[in-house]
């Protein structure tokens, strides 16, 4: 069964975002892990192992879902057991970009991933996060819906702040007129 069919079957069976994944991931699958304040992403390698980004100072044990990982500027590429990274959180297989991006051959995905294990990489929540990392491995292009949502929220707040500043400036000028 291909990834698109497995994803469709999961949705048809009523699997929701916060249920523990009941099917076995296949090498090359994207794994979405639901942390309390964000989603962490990993790529399944096989035999229970994933590759993911962890903050440089977090060490091997990453079951702790620290928010500091979101604000870290550097990350290390680690190969870890999926069950240890997930801990008490929930996860699902989520190859959501397969409709728009063609996955690379599984052997190439795994080879590219294994070459990066142990390397330190730059991390940026908006431009180079864990979702960008795993989608770059799977598709050859880094994509992050989570980053796009964050950029949209920041843009909205900035636009609102600008509008209030302009309105405040207009209001102040109209009160200071002598006539």
UniProtKB/Swiss-Prot annotation:
All copies of domain LRAT, residue ranges: 30-146
Cytoplasmic side: 1-149
Keywords on record: Cytoplasm, Endoplasmic reticulum, Hydrolase, Lipid degradation, Lipid metabolism, Lysosome, Membrane, Mitochondrion, Transferase, Transmembrane, Transmembrane helix
Subcellular location, record wording: Membrane; Cytoplasm, Cytosol; Mitochondrion membrane; Lysosome membrane
EC numbers for this chain: 2.3.1.-, 3.1.1.32, 3.1.1.4
Pfam family, one: LRAT
One term of GO molecular function: phospholipase A1 activity
Xref: PANTHER family: HRAS-LIKE SUPPRESSOR - RELATED, PHOSPHOLIPASE A AND ACYLTRANSFERASE 1
Stated role: Exhibits both phospholipase A1/2 and acyltransferase activities. Shows phospholipase A1 (PLA1) and A2 (PLA2) activity, catalyzing the calcium-independent release of fatty acids from the sn-1 or sn-2 position of glycerophospholipids. Shows O-acyltransferase activity, catalyzing the transfer of a fatty acyl group from glycerophospholipid to the hydroxyl group of lysophospholipid.
Name listed for the protein in its UniProt record: Phospholipase A and acyltransferase 1
């Amino acid at each position: 069964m291909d990834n698109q069919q497995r994803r469709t079957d999961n949705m048809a069976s009523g699997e929701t975002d916060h249920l523990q994944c009941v099917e076995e991931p296949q090498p090359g699958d994207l794994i979405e892990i639901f942390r309390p304040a964000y989603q962490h992403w990993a790529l399944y390698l096989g035999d229970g192992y994933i590759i993911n980004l962890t903050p440089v100072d977090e060490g091997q044990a990453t079951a702790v879902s620290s928010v500091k990982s979101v604000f870290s500027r550097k990350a290390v590429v680690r190969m870890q057991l999926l069950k240890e990274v997930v801990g008490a959180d929930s996860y699902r297989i989520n190859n959501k970009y397969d409709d728009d991006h063609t996955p690379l051959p599984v052997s190439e995905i795994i080879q590219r991933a294994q070459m990066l294990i142990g390397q330190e990489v730059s991390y940026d929540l908006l431009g180079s996060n864990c979702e960008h990392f795993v989608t770059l491995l799977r598709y050859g292009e880094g994509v992050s819906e989570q980053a796009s949502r964050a950029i949209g929220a920041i843009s909205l707040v900035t636009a609102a702040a600008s509008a209030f500043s302009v309105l405040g400036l207009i209001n102040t000028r109209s009160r200071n007129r002598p006539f």
